Amino acid sequence: MKAGVVHAKNDIRFEEIKTPVPEKGQVLVKVKYTGICGSDVPRVNGDACHFFPNVLGHEFSGVVETVGEGVSSLKPGDRVAGVPLVPCMECEDCRKGNYSLCKHYSFIGSREFGSFAEYVAVPEKNAVKFEDSVSFEQGAFFEPATVALHGLLRTGYQGGEDVAVLGGGTIGLFTAQWAKIFGAKRVTVFDISDERLKLAKKLSIDNGINTLEEDF
C-alpha cells in the first residue's frame, strides 16, 4: 500500500509499504479521509516523533476491509471513524474507566502506524461505526469534535451562558459550535486570523474578534 512515511526529522516520503494484516480483535480499515492535526507538525519537523520510520495520522474515517479473529461488532463494508487512544485496560486508571490517564497507552498515528496510508489496522473498539447519512469527510472530524466537547464539558459549562473561545482553529471552532448546540447565550471567538474568523461567522458563531486589530 502507499503511505506517507516519516523517516527522520523533516523527512516524510510517499512510498510503498506492507499492508497490515488485522490481528485478533482488530479490523483493517481502508482510509477514505484523514486530517492533519497540529500535533502532527512537530512529529515531522520537530522532535516529537516516537520512532522512525513512522506513519502518522489519527483523525480518519474509512471502510472496514477485513476483520481479525474474534471481532463481532463490525463487518467488511461498515463505515467507521477512528479513535486513536489505545488504553492498556489493565492499569489502575483503566480499571476505573479513566482511559485518558492510562500509564501504558498506545496511540494510533504516533506510537503505532496511523492513517496517512491506504490502510490502517486498529482494535475493534477503536473503530466507531457511523450511518450512511454521515459523509466520510464528516466522519474524519469525529476525533477533533470529541476533543472539543470534552474540553467544554470539563469547564462545567451551563447552557444560557456567554462563551469566549480563545483561538479559532479546528478545536476552537468545534468548541464554539458545541457551545451553540448546548444553548450558549452568545459565543465569541478570538483569533488573529481573519480567515478563521470568517469561517466562524459562516458556522453561525455570534461574534469574532481579531485581537491584533480590536481593543476588547
Each model region followed by its residue ranges:
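Residues that mark the start of a beta-strand
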Residues: 2, 26-28, 162
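Short Gly/Pro-enriched turn/cap motifs at secondary-structure boundaries
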Residues: 7, 18-19, 51-57, 108-112
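Glycine-rich beta-strand-centered segment in the early N-terminal region that forms part
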Residues: 20-34, 47-92, 131-134
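Cytochrome P450 core scaffold surrounding the K-helix E-X-X-R motif
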Residues: 39-43
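Short, intrinsically disordered, charge-balanced linker/junction segments flanking boundaries
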Residues: 73, 213-216
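NAD(P)H dinucleotide-binding glycine-rich loop of Rossmann-like/cofactor-binding domains
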Residues: 88-166
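Mid-domain Rossmann-like dinucleotide-binding core that forms the NAD(H)/NADP(H) cofactor-binding site
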Residues: 135-213
